[in-house]
Amino acid sequence: MAPEIQEGQEPVGYSRILIATDGSECSALAGRHAIYLAEGLAAELFVLYVVNVARAFHTGIHYGEAVAELERFGKEATARIREMAEKRGVRCEERVVSGRPHDAIITVSEEIEADLVVVGSTGMRSVERVLIGSESEKVLYHCKRPVLLIRDT
């Protein structure tokens, strides 16, 4: 049995949903979940890609070229989700920002006053998880907004 809403309490509502994408299949799945929720709740969708500047240092090409390539990739990744959303009649805004992914996701979620943050989570080997953790885990543990974690199946 669901708990009753107490006098003076407002029911939870989602009018702004943030979906963070890295362009992966798991992010596409998370995007489909976010679109489904946004459509059903008449919520606005914000699609975010974070250019991981630390990754640009390890590409083996000039830093500026690497960042530009990651920005292009990010615009394509956000556009794919936006196109899916628009086909369903969901209002959508795209953002591509630079920084550490979990920090940027949390910052943008606060800036737009997101009611829900949706992120995908791909499997990591246990050694990687112990050493660095995943970006989605960092969002899950540090974000003050509700987070919906979509696991890769």
Q: Where are these predicted regions, by residue range?
A:
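Small/aliphatic-rich secondary-structure junction motif
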Residues: 7-61
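Conserved beta-strand positions in the Rossmann-like core of class I SAM-dependent methyltransferases
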Residues: 46, 93, 148
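Short, hinge-like loop/turn segments at secondary-structure boundaries
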Residues: 63-66, 111-113, 135-136
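A short acidic, glycine-rich active-site loop
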Residues: 64-76
